[in-house]
Regions:
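Helix-coil boundary/capping segments in enzymes
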Residues: 1-188
Length: 188
């Protein structure tokens, strides 16, 4: 834990996390998928999506035990874990739900292992309203989950699109949603 005077905690509310279980699912996808993951690089897995590659992911992106050591080194008390690009919205409905559940379960696992260090922002398959609402309800029972992390633009649709109204109503009843800016900055 950090040594800041006065007991003030340092909280990183925008801490991206690619659980190994999520990456393993991506690595099992065939070459026709717009998103894949390769574990062939010595420095870490590489995610390929929409024609580009991430740099090799450092172990702290996918191993929450290693991440705690880095948090200690940097004086950070709590990470609010969130998935970043490519998220799940590119996938067919069944895969989007599987990836969301896998990610959310991994966040809960990190919280159970380090309850004072990790909280999670859930991922939902936003383009499938019924599945997203069910996962939103399931997420409420997972330990350490404190909100939802959507993009402001999902497959060309802004959060103001009526497709997302059921999710937004569910979140309003449920509490916090952390909404990162993405896509054109016309309005947020």
């Amino acid at each position: 834990m950090s040594a800041f005077a006065g007991g003030i905690q340092t909280i990183d509310i925008h801490a991206h996390f690619y659980p190994e279980s999520y990456l393993r699912i991506l690595s099992e996808l065939d070459g026709e998928s717009p998103v894949t993951c390769s574990w062939d690089h010595a420095d870490g897995p590489i995610i390929t999506f929409w024609g580009g590659d991430t740099p090799p992911l450092h172990k702290t992106y996918y191993d929450f035990h290693e991440r705690v050591k880095e948090m200690d080194d940097k004086g950070v008390d709590i990470h609010c874990l969130s998935l970043t690009q490519p998220m799940v919205h590119w996938a067919d409905p069944a895969l989007a739900l599987k990836l969301s559940e896998t990610y959310n379960d991994a966040c809960a696992e990190a919280h159970k292992a380090y309850p004072d260090r990790y909280l999670g922002f859930a991922m939902l398959p936003m383009l499938q309203p019924d599945a997203a609402l069910e996962e939103l309800k399931r997420r409420a029972d997972l330990p350490g989950m404190r909100g939802v992390y959507p993009s402001t633009q999902i497959e060309g649709r802004e959060l103001s699109d009526t497709l997302f109204f059921p999710h937004l109503r569910g979140r309003a009843r449920d509490g916090l949603a952390h909404v990162p800016a993405s896509g054109p900055r016309r309005r947020i």
